[in-house]
């Protein structure tokens, strides 16, 4: 798989901010204008319905499972006062989000609630790194860490970057396709012109510059690496481009019309350990300041190679050896 929702938790929070604005309809008495009064009442009722859908979805989403020590660490984070990191894991399956599989999207979103900045760091799926608690120091593909569970993927990235990652979001192929379609498609700025192959889901002619994608086209754009000279390095950049496009579309006024459907879809195909109260606190912070978020994207890079991997005994595999550069 190769992305999802954008940073699904960030996408969700931004969408929630828009929905929350609908609740803040000014109350104004207009004597003798009963029709206007009924209209305002109807709008308030509609806004209440949106917020009910939002809260219900939040309760459904926050159902991730993890070790007790990780739960305690996540619960202790004050998301309105201190920077925090969220691991976005895109697994390579359709359907049930609880399946354990390879993590082909590995993005760390570091959020600063005070400065309203989000840093997205993409790590290639083929990054050649040790898997803590599994490989005994032997290197493996980062994507293989996902087969040992979400906590193992988080530990691998924490060791690689020497950072704490208290939160995670898991999404899959289905998450991306359905959320992009509910948004009415997205406009993605591609650095390159290329054609995706059937192994990426479908054949799509991608042009350099702006492309309008539906869900399946966006997934194919994110999955393709064989047609790219830089392979997995470029694919990571393409994933970030899709996330940014989804965030931009989620902040448009049209999201209000599709609000309940989007929220329902996110709840069905997303798993996170961020609590309902923490997500709601992020909403509160935004409403208090109403300042926009600045999103910065960077990607870890490396050198393509063929090496033996701990989790695969059938021979050497294509990997990316880290070179210590993030750009």
Segments predicted by a language model, with ranges:
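Non-catalytic, solvent-exposed segments at the cell envelope interface
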Residues: 2-8, 25-42, 46-327
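Alpha-helical transmembrane segments
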Residues: 10-23
């Amino acid at each position: 798989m190769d992305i999802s929702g954008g940073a699904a938790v960030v996408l969700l929070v931004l969408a929630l901010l828009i929905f929350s604005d609908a609740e803040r309809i000014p109350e104004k008495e207009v004597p003798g204008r009963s029709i206007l009064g009924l209209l305002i009442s109807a709008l308030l009722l509609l806004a209440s319905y949106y917020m009910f859908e939002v809260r219900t979805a939040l309760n459904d989403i926050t159902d991730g499972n993890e070790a007790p020590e990780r739960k305690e660490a996540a619960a202790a984070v004050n998301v309105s006062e201190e920077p925090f990191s969220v691991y976005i894991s895109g697994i390579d399956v359709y359907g049930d989000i609880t399946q354990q599989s390879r993590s082909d999207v590995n993005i760390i979103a570091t959020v600063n609630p005070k400065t309203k900045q989000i840093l997205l760091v993409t790590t290639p799926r083929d990054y050649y790194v040790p898997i803590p608690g599994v490989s005994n120091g032997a290197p493996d593909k980062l994507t293989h860490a996902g087969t040992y569970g979400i906590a193992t993927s988080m530990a691998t990235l924490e060791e690689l970057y020497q950072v704490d990652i208290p939160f995670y979001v898991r999404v899959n192929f289905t998450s991306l396709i359905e959320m992009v379609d509910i948004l009415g498609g997205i406009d993605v700025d591609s650095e390159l012109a290329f054609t995706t192959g059937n192994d990426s889901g479908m054949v799509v002619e991608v042009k350099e510059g702006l492309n309008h994608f539906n869900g399946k086209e966006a997934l194919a754009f994110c999955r393709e690496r064989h047609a790219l000279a830089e392979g997995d390095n470029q694919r990571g950049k393409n994933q970030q481009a899709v996330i940014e496009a989804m965030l931009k579309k989620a902040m448009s006024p049209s999201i209000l019309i599709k609000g309940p459907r989007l929220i329902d879809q996110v709840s069905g195909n997303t798993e996170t350990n961020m609590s309902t109260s923490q997500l709601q606190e992020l909403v509160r912070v935004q409403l208090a300041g109403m300042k926009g978020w600045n999103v910065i994207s960077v990607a870890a890079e490396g050198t393509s190679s063929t090496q033996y991997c701990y989790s695969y005994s059938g021979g050497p595999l294509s990997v990316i050896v880290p070179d210590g550069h993030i750009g």
